[in-house]
Protein backbone atom coordinates (compact mmCIF):
# COMPACT_ATOMS: atom_id res chain seq x y z
CA UNK A 1 0.00 0.00 0.00
CA UNK A 2 2.80 2.43 0.89
CA UNK A 3 4.57 1.70 -2.38
CA UNK A 4 1.35 2.31 -4.32
CA UNK A 5 0.82 5.66 -2.58
CA UNK A 6 4.40 6.68 -3.34
CA UNK A 7 3.95 5.84 -7.03
CA UNK A 8 0.68 7.79 -7.16
CA UNK A 9 2.32 10.80 -5.50
CA UNK A 10 5.23 10.58 -7.92
CA UNK A 11 2.87 10.53 -10.91
CA UNK A 12 0.88 13.50 -9.57
CA UNK A 13 4.11 15.40 -8.96
CA UNK A 14 5.25 14.84 -12.53
CA UNK A 15 1.91 15.96 -13.89
CA UNK A 16 2.05 19.14 -11.81
CA UNK A 17 5.56 19.92 -13.02
CA UNK A 18 4.48 19.37 -16.61
CA UNK A 19 1.64 21.88 -16.15
CA UNK A 20 3.89 24.41 -14.45
CA UNK A 21 6.00 26.35 -17.02
CA UNK A 22 8.54 27.33 -14.37
CA UNK A 23 9.55 23.74 -13.74
CA UNK A 24 9.06 22.43 -17.26
CA UNK A 25 12.73 22.80 -18.15
CA UNK A 26 13.54 20.09 -15.61
CA UNK A 27 11.62 17.48 -17.52
CA UNK A 28 13.16 15.51 -20.36
CA UNK A 29 11.65 16.53 -23.69
CA UNK A 30 12.32 15.11 -27.13
CA UNK A 31 12.49 17.83 -29.73
CA UNK A 32 11.01 16.80 -33.05
CA UNK A 33 11.26 18.68 -36.32
CA UNK A 34 9.77 17.80 -39.67
CA UNK A 35 12.11 18.28 -42.63
CA UNK A 36 11.30 17.90 -46.30
CA UNK A 37 13.13 14.94 -47.82
CA UNK A 38 12.89 16.10 -51.43
CA UNK A 39 14.82 18.96 -53.06
CA UNK A 40 13.02 22.20 -53.80
CA UNK A 41 12.41 21.92 -57.55
CA UNK A 42 11.41 25.58 -57.80
CA UNK A 43 14.85 26.96 -56.92
CA UNK A 44 15.72 27.45 -60.59
CA UNK A 45 12.75 29.80 -60.91
CA UNK A 46 13.04 31.56 -57.55
CA UNK A 47 16.76 32.26 -57.80
CA UNK A 48 16.55 33.76 -61.29
CA UNK A 49 13.07 35.14 -61.90
CA UNK A 50 13.77 36.68 -65.30
CA UNK A 51 15.74 33.82 -66.80
CA UNK A 52 14.35 30.99 -68.91
CA UNK A 53 15.09 28.10 -66.56
CA UNK A 54 11.98 26.01 -67.14
CA UNK A 55 13.97 23.07 -68.60
CA UNK A 56 16.10 22.90 -65.44
CA UNK A 57 13.02 23.30 -63.26
CA UNK A 58 11.19 20.50 -65.07
CA UNK A 59 14.00 18.00 -65.65
CA UNK A 60 16.98 18.48 -63.32
CA UNK A 61 15.65 16.33 -60.50
CA UNK A 62 14.02 13.60 -62.57
CA UNK A 63 15.53 13.14 -66.04
CA UNK A 64 18.24 10.43 -66.42
CA UNK A 65 20.45 12.94 -68.24
CA UNK A 66 21.08 14.64 -64.88
CA UNK A 67 21.69 11.53 -62.77
CA UNK A 68 25.41 12.29 -62.34
CA UNK A 69 24.90 15.98 -61.60
CA UNK A 70 25.28 17.38 -58.06
CA UNK A 71 22.15 17.64 -55.94
CA UNK A 72 20.99 21.23 -55.40
CA UNK A 73 17.84 22.75 -53.93
CA UNK A 74 18.76 21.33 -50.52
CA UNK A 75 18.82 23.41 -47.35
CA UNK A 76 21.45 22.96 -44.65
CA UNK A 77 18.89 21.24 -42.45
CA UNK A 78 18.04 18.79 -45.22
CA UNK A 79 21.72 18.06 -45.80
CA UNK A 80 22.17 17.26 -42.10
CA UNK A 81 19.07 15.05 -42.17
CA UNK A 82 20.51 13.17 -45.16
CA UNK A 83 23.74 12.56 -43.23
CA UNK A 84 21.73 11.06 -40.37
CA UNK A 85 19.74 8.89 -42.77
CA UNK A 86 22.90 7.72 -44.53
CA UNK A 87 24.44 6.73 -41.19
CA UNK A 88 21.34 4.74 -40.24
CA UNK A 89 21.17 3.09 -43.68
CA UNK A 90 24.85 2.11 -43.65
CA UNK A 91 24.84 0.79 -40.11
CA UNK A 92 21.67 -1.23 -40.74
CA UNK A 93 23.59 -2.99 -43.51
CA UNK A 94 26.63 -3.44 -41.25
CA UNK A 95 24.48 -5.06 -38.57
CA UNK A 96 22.87 -7.37 -41.11
CA UNK A 97 26.31 -8.55 -42.25
CA UNK A 98 27.71 -8.74 -38.69
CA UNK A 99 30.26 -6.05 -39.48
CA UNK A 100 31.42 -3.24 -37.18
CA UNK A 101 29.38 -0.06 -37.25
CA UNK A 102 30.78 3.03 -38.98
CA UNK A 103 31.07 6.52 -37.54
CA UNK A 104 28.35 9.04 -38.29
CA UNK A 105 28.27 10.66 -41.69
CA UNK A 106 28.14 14.44 -41.46
CA UNK A 107 28.92 17.67 -43.26
CA UNK A 108 32.58 18.70 -43.16
CA UNK A 109 33.57 21.54 -40.90
CA UNK A 110 34.83 24.65 -42.61
CA UNK A 111 38.44 23.76 -41.71
CA UNK A 112 38.04 20.19 -42.97
CA UNK A 113 36.56 21.44 -46.23
CA UNK A 114 39.47 23.83 -46.83
CA UNK A 115 42.02 21.14 -46.00
CA UNK A 116 40.41 18.81 -48.53
CA UNK A 117 40.09 21.56 -51.15
CA UNK A 118 43.78 22.44 -50.96
CA UNK A 119 44.67 18.88 -51.88
CA UNK A 120 47.96 18.89 -50.01
CA UNK A 121 49.11 22.24 -51.47
CA UNK A 122 49.03 24.64 -48.48
CA UNK A 123 49.89 27.77 -50.45
CA UNK A 124 47.61 27.09 -53.42
CA UNK A 125 45.10 29.75 -54.46
CA UNK A 126 42.78 27.21 -56.06
CA UNK A 127 42.41 23.43 -55.60
CA UNK A 128 44.66 22.79 -58.62
CA UNK A 129 47.50 24.64 -56.89
CA UNK A 130 48.23 27.47 -59.30
CA UNK A 131 46.96 31.07 -59.11
CA UNK A 132 45.64 30.82 -62.68
CA UNK A 133 42.17 29.92 -63.93
CA UNK A 134 43.34 28.65 -67.33
CA UNK A 135 45.53 25.68 -68.18
CA UNK A 136 48.38 25.82 -70.72
CA UNK A 137 45.87 25.21 -73.52
CA UNK A 138 43.76 28.19 -72.57
CA UNK A 139 40.90 26.12 -71.11
CA UNK A 140 39.18 27.05 -67.87
CA UNK A 141 39.87 24.73 -64.94
CA UNK A 142 36.47 25.06 -63.24
CA UNK A 143 32.82 25.87 -63.84
CA UNK A 144 32.21 29.49 -62.84
CA UNK A 145 31.33 32.92 -64.27
CA UNK A 146 34.49 34.27 -65.94
CA UNK A 147 33.08 37.71 -66.75
CA UNK A 148 30.00 39.79 -65.99
CA UNK A 149 27.06 38.08 -67.71
CA UNK A 150 29.35 35.44 -69.24
CA UNK A 151 28.38 31.95 -68.10
CA UNK A 152 29.40 29.92 -71.14
CA UNK A 153 33.12 30.58 -71.73
CA UNK A 154 33.99 27.60 -69.52
CA UNK A 155 31.77 25.34 -71.69
CA UNK A 156 29.08 25.18 -69.00
CA UNK A 157 26.09 27.46 -68.50
CA UNK A 158 24.66 25.85 -65.37
CA UNK A 159 25.90 23.00 -63.20
CA UNK A 160 27.68 20.12 -64.94
CA UNK A 161 28.38 16.48 -64.06
CA UNK A 162 30.03 15.89 -60.71
CA UNK A 163 33.23 14.52 -62.27
CA UNK A 164 33.70 17.31 -64.80
CA UNK A 165 37.08 19.09 -64.94
CA UNK A 166 40.19 17.62 -63.31
CA UNK A 167 40.30 16.60 -59.62
CA UNK A 168 42.80 18.00 -57.13
CA UNK A 169 45.70 15.99 -55.72
CA UNK A 170 43.34 14.29 -53.24
CA UNK A 171 41.28 13.10 -56.23
CA UNK A 172 38.37 15.33 -55.24
CA UNK A 173 36.34 16.85 -58.05
CA UNK A 174 34.90 20.35 -58.21
CA UNK A 175 36.08 21.57 -54.84
CA UNK A 176 35.86 24.95 -56.53
CA UNK A 177 33.10 25.86 -58.94
CA UNK A 178 30.11 23.92 -60.28
CA UNK A 179 28.05 24.12 -57.05
CA UNK A 180 29.03 25.67 -53.73
CA UNK A 181 28.86 23.39 -50.69
CA UNK A 182 27.34 23.51 -47.24
CA UNK A 183 29.64 22.99 -44.27
CA UNK A 184 28.77 22.09 -40.71
CA UNK A 185 30.17 25.37 -39.38
CA UNK A 186 28.19 28.42 -38.35
CA UNK A 187 29.21 31.68 -39.97
CA UNK A 188 30.97 34.48 -38.14
CA UNK A 189 32.99 37.04 -40.11
CA UNK A 190 35.64 37.15 -37.37
CA UNK A 191 35.76 33.43 -36.56
CA UNK A 192 39.38 32.99 -37.62
CA UNK A 193 40.50 35.46 -34.97
CA UNK A 194 39.30 33.53 -31.93
CA UNK A 195 38.56 29.89 -32.77
CA UNK A 196 40.99 27.27 -31.47
CA UNK A 197 43.63 26.10 -33.92
CA UNK A 198 43.13 22.58 -32.55
CA UNK A 199 39.40 22.66 -33.25
CA UNK A 200 38.69 25.50 -35.70
CA UNK A 201 34.95 25.12 -35.92
CA UNK A 202 32.07 27.44 -35.14
CA UNK A 203 28.98 25.35 -34.44
CA UNK A 204 26.30 27.45 -32.77
CA UNK A 205 22.72 26.23 -32.62
CA UNK A 206 21.38 29.78 -32.40
CA UNK A 207 23.34 30.98 -35.45
CA UNK A 208 21.15 30.48 -38.51
CA UNK A 209 23.87 31.42 -40.99
CA UNK A 210 26.00 28.49 -42.15
CA UNK A 211 29.30 28.63 -43.99
CA UNK A 212 29.20 27.89 -47.72
CA UNK A 213 32.44 27.18 -49.55
CA UNK A 214 33.80 26.63 -53.04
CA UNK A 215 31.84 29.02 -55.22
CA UNK A 216 29.52 27.90 -58.01
CA UNK A 217 28.67 28.17 -61.68
CA UNK A 218 27.10 31.60 -61.09
CA UNK A 219 29.99 33.05 -59.04
CA UNK A 220 33.05 35.04 -60.09
CA UNK A 221 36.58 33.73 -59.57
CA UNK A 222 37.00 35.27 -56.12
CA UNK A 223 34.62 32.74 -54.57
CA UNK A 224 36.54 29.83 -56.12
CA UNK A 225 39.59 30.52 -53.95
CA UNK A 226 40.07 27.89 -51.26
CA UNK A 227 40.28 30.67 -48.66
CA UNK A 228 37.08 32.49 -49.67
CA UNK A 229 34.11 32.31 -47.30
CA UNK A 230 30.41 32.84 -47.88
CA UNK A 231 27.22 31.95 -46.04
CA UNK A 232 23.56 31.15 -46.48
CA UNK A 233 20.72 30.70 -44.00
CA UNK A 234 20.24 27.13 -42.82
CA UNK A 235 16.63 26.82 -43.98
CA UNK A 236 17.29 28.22 -47.47
CA UNK A 237 17.72 26.11 -50.60
CA UNK A 238 19.49 27.37 -53.71
CA UNK A 239 20.04 26.17 -57.27
CA UNK A 240 23.78 26.64 -56.83
CA UNK A 241 24.43 25.10 -53.38
CA UNK A 242 24.94 21.37 -52.82
CA UNK A 243 26.89 19.31 -50.30
CA UNK A 244 29.19 16.34 -49.79
CA UNK A 245 29.43 14.11 -46.73
CA UNK A 246 32.41 12.99 -44.64
CA UNK A 247 33.00 10.63 -41.75
CA UNK A 248 35.92 9.49 -39.62
CA UNK A 249 37.29 6.27 -41.08
CA UNK A 250 38.74 3.67 -38.74
CA UNK A 251 40.77 0.75 -40.00
CA UNK A 252 43.48 -1.66 -38.90
CA UNK A 253 47.02 -1.72 -40.24
CA UNK A 254 46.19 -4.95 -42.10
CA UNK A 255 43.28 -3.26 -43.86
CA UNK A 256 45.49 -0.32 -44.79
CA UNK A 257 47.98 -2.66 -46.45
Region annotations inferred by a language model:
Residues 1-7, 11-13, 251-257:
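Single conserved hydrophobic/aromatic residue that forms the stacking wall/gate
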Residues 239-250:
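Short, structured beta-strand segments at or near domain termini in extracellular proteins/domains
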Residues 7, 124, 243:
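Small-molecule pocket liners
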Residues 17-18:
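Long, internal stretches of domain cores in catalytic or enzyme-like folds
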Residues 200-204, 230-237:
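Short proline/glycine-enriched turn/loop segments at secondary-structure junctions
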Residues 154, 237-239:
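A short catalytic or substrate-binding loop motif that flags glycine-/basic-rich loops and adjacent residues
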Residues 22-226:
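Functional-site microenvironments in short loops/helix caps that host divalent-cation chemistry
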